[in-house]
From Swiss-Prot:
It catalyses: di-trans,octa-cis-undecaprenyl diphosphate + H2O = di-trans,octa-cis-undecaprenyl phosphate + phosphate + H(+). Belongs to the UppP family. Bacitracin is thought to be involved in the inhibition of peptidoglycan synthesis by sequestering undecaprenyl diphosphate, thereby reducing the pool of lipid carrier available. Its EC number is 3.6.1.27. GO terms for cellular component: plasma membrane. GO terms for biological process: cell wall organization; peptidoglycan biosynthetic process; regulation of cell shape; response to antibiotic. It comes from Chlorobaculum tepidum (strain ATCC 49652 / DSM 12025 / NBRC 103806 / TLS). Keywords: Antibiotic resistance, Cell inner membrane, Cell membrane, Cell shape, Cell wall biogenesis/degradation, Hydrolase, Membrane, Peptidoglycan synthesis, Transmembrane, Transmembrane helix. Catalyzes the dephosphorylation of undecaprenyl diphosphate (UPP). Confers resistance to bacitracin. Its main location: membrane. The chain crosses the membrane at residues 1-21, 40-60, 89-109, 112-132, 153-173, 196-216, 228-248, 258-278. This is Undecaprenyl-diphosphatase.
Length: 282
């Protein structure tokens, strides 16, 4: 991988991490189309630290408030004493499924599940599920029922959205896509579903990035070229990730996820056609 490729992949990671179109799919598809080769699951996990930093900075006020409330609640012996503390523990509970599945199926995630057949099926599959979720949201709104706020989430909501997040381990599904979809099914409004999705991503993205960084440390340190590529890609992911968060939260205040559904369907079907005609290797 050269520096130009690293920059492009970092930009792609940042732009697609928070949109419900799957960053892992695009980091698999673009190199395949350009003839660059698969950058690998480890590269993807490490540059996600850049998008993690984007979430930390964008939601700094919320994160400080939630973390402070959790610590204060533990000190006072009232761990669920405030809405912020309760949200913090819900994020922790919602993180458990992806940790369990991620460690259990780590080998499969890094090998067979990166097939473009899997990616295309995931792109199309989640698009169809998201259609149903949007229909559910429209029915709720038509009945005059408002969406839940983050403070109104139940433990069942947190577990179900957490289980949905575990599906993001399959390339093409999209972390934000599956968690926003789960949130819509649990009667969150679109913006709240996206906000909780981003906060929920923090523990798992940090853990995955640190694990891959530790496991590949010798390979990274063996070459300043590798270090530079990772650093540049991570910085690009941070910049464009921050912009992507701001865009999506503002967009979902007034729009449905319809444009992303259409994009996923077109890309998924296009992949199948290109693979079937021999223009792209799976």
């Amino acid at each position: 991988m050269n520096l130009f490729q690293a920059i492009i992949l970092g930009i792609i990671q940042g732009l697609t991490e928070f949109l419900p179109i799957s960053s892992s799919a695009h980091l698999r598809i673009v190199p395949a189309l350009m003839g660059w080769g698969d950058p690998g699951a480890a590269f993807t996990a490490i540059i996600q630290i850049g998008t993690l930093a984007a979430v930390l900075i964008y939601f700094a006020k919320d994160i400080v408030s939630i973390s402070g409330a959790v610590i204060s609640g533990l000190v006072k012996g009232k761990p669920l004493g405030t809405d912020e503390a309760r949200t913090g523990w819900m994020i922790a509970v919602g993180t458990i499924p992806i940790v369990v599945f991620g460690l259990t199926f780590k080998h499969e995630i890094e090998t067979v599940l990166r097939s473009l057949y899997i990616v295309s099926a995931s792109m199309i599959g989640l698009a169809l599920v998201l259609v149903v979720a949007e229909k559910h949201t429209a029915n709720r709104a038509r009945d005059g029922r408002r969406g839940k706020s983050i403070n109104e989430l139940s433990w069942t909501d947190a577990i179900i959205i957490g289980l949905a997040q575990a599906m993001a381990l399959i390339p093409g599904s999209s972390r934000s896509g599956v968690t926003i979809t789960g949130g819509l099914f649990r009667n969150l409004d679109r913006e709240t579903a996206a906000r909780f999705s981003f906060l929920l991503s923090l523990p798992s993205v940090f853990a995955a990035g640190m694990l891959e960084l530790y496991q590949t440390r010798q390979e990274i340190m063996s070459s300043t070229h590798n270090m530079l590529n990772l650093a540049v890609a991570t910085i690009a992911a941070f910049i464009f990730g921050y912009l992507s968060i701001a865009f999506l939260l503002n967009y979902l205040k007034r729009h449905t996820t319809g444009i992303f559904i259409a994009y996923r369907l077109i890309l998924g079907i296009g992949l199948i056609v290109m693979i079937g005609t021999g223009h792209l290797l799976p």
